[in-house]
Amino acid sequence: NIDLIYLDPPYNQHPYGSNYFMLNVIAENKEPEEVSRVSGIPKKWNKSNYNYYKSAIESMRNLLEESVNKSKYILLSYNNEGIIKEDDWEELFQEYDIKKYEIKYNAYRASRNLSSRNDKVIERMYLINKK
C-alpha cells in the first residue's frame, strides 16, 4: 500500500500526449515515426476516455475505485472548465471522504477566440480517502 496517488487527468478534448510530446521524445531519445506537417506533433497520439464527456465520468469512477484500494489518499487536480462538471464530481465523490481546496488563477487567453473566456480559472484539488 502507498500513501498518496496524485491524479491530474485531461480537462478537455486535448490529449496530454500532444501537449507533452517533446518531453516524451527527449525521454525516449527516439524521433517520432510520423509527424504532422502543420503542428509538428506525432500523428500516433490518441485521445483517452478522459477527453470525451460520455466516457470521462465512468473512466474516472473506475480509476477512483482502483486507486482508493491502493493508497491511503488520492489527490486529484481538476479545473472548473473541465469536461467533468462540479455536479458530476459531487456524484462521483458520494462514497468517499473529500476535502476540497480551490485556487483561482488568471486564465490563459492568448488567442482572439478565447477573448470571451472568464478572467479567472478555478483549480480544484480534492483530497480523497475511503469513508
Describe the role of every protein-language-model region.
Residues 1-131:
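Class I S-adenosyl-L-methionine-dependent methyltransferase catalytic core
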